[in-house]
Every structure is written in C-alpha cells, then in structure tokens.
C-alpha cells in the first residue's frame, strides 16, 4: 500500500474522489481522518464514500465521519433526507447513532418508528434505537431526554421486531431516569419473548443496583 504523503486538504479529498480501488479509498479516508479535516468538501467526499461498492470502504468512512463529529452531523442529516438509497441511509444512521448528537434526534426517531419492509431495515431500526440511547445519556436537554424515552418506550412495547424491543431495553437501561425505569418495568410485565424478557429483566436489575 502506497502511503499518502499529502498535507493539503484538497489533495486528500481529490485522492479519495479519484480512488480506483478499495485500498486506495481506505488509505485516503484514513488520511482525511488523521488530518482532522472538517471542510465541506472533505465531509462530502466521506459521505459519498458510504456508497462505495466495497463494504470495508463504507465502514472506514463511517468511522471517519464519527471521528470528525460534530462537524459532520448536519451534512449527514441532509444526505439522509435527500437520498432514496437504503444502503446509503443505513450507513448514515450508523454514523449518526454512534455520534449521538441532539440534532440527529428527529432522524433517528423517524427510523425507529417506520415499518419494516425487510431484515436490513429492521437492523437499521435497532441501530437507530441505540442512537437514541446515546443521545439520552449525553444531552443536557430534559425535553430531548423525555422524547427519547417516549420513542424508546414505544419501541419496547409496540413493534413485532424482537430485536428492536431488545435494543430499546438496552437504551432505556442506559438512560436510567425514573421514567425510563418505569418503562422497563412495564415492558417486563408484558414481554412474551424469552430472550427480550431476560434482557429487560437484566436492565431492571442493573438499574435497581445503582
């Protein structure tokens, strides 16, 4: 692998945009990430890399976008809203969920609350639910915390997707406010799936011990 020796941000972005192989693309992404470039062109190039046909490139781009946050958040939200590519949207949700920025709340809540058309979308919903948990434990805004708990409570009690209910239980455990604990107790009382019920029970027990 040829080491990139560019120091100019435009050169790094150009290298990524012109990458002819996954190896070249990953090297360029790593260079942008290491340089901590947060210029619009760099962020745009990283978001475009999420659509690369090689999964390792998209994964590297997600990691870079998370590292360069919060500067990347608005661009990620805009890209999500303007895209109809479910694959691209899934990677964007991964990034936003890991970042856990308040500004992504509406997008993550929307994803959690949409109907499942296939297994892939179901997985994205679970990632979004974990993102709401991240926001719930990092934000200083009581209203945002309340809305996160509301959406996670819905996700815990309503959907047929057991994986989403499981993810909601983990997120509510992390938030651990009285409201979140009450939601977990309700979930424990009504959950029929053994795996999910066990996870909710663990969440309730851990919260009681704190």
Could you say what each language-model-derived stretch is?
Residues 5-9, 39-43, 73, 104-109, ...:
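Core helices of alpha-solenoid repeat scaffolds
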């Amino acid at each position: 692998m040829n080491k990139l020796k560019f120091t100019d941000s435009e050169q790094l972005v150009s290298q990524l945009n012109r990458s002819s192989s996954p190896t070249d693309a990953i090297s360029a992404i790593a260079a942008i990430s290491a340089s901590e470039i947060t210029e619009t062109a760099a962020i745009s190039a990283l978001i475009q890399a999420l659509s690369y046909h090689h999964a390792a490139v998209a994964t590297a781009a997600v990691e870079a976008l998370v590292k360069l946050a919060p500067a990347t958040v608005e661009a990620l939200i805009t890209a999500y809203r303007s895209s109809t590519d479910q694959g691209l949207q899934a990677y964007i949700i991964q990034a936003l969920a890991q970042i856990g920025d308040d500004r992504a709340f509406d997008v993550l809540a929307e994803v959690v609350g949409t109907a499942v058309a296939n297994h892939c979308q179901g997985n994205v919903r679970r990632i979004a639910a974990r993102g709401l948990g991240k926001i719930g434990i990092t934000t200083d805004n009581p209203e945002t915390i309340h809305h996160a708990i509301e959406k996670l409570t819905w996700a815990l009690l309503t959907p047929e997707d057991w994986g989403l209910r499981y993810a909601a239980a983990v997120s509510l455990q992390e938030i651990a406010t009285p409201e979140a604990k009450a939601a977990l107790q309700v979930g424990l009382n009504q959950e029929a799936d053994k795996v999910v019920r066990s996870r909710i029970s663990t969440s309730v027990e851990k919260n009681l011990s704190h």
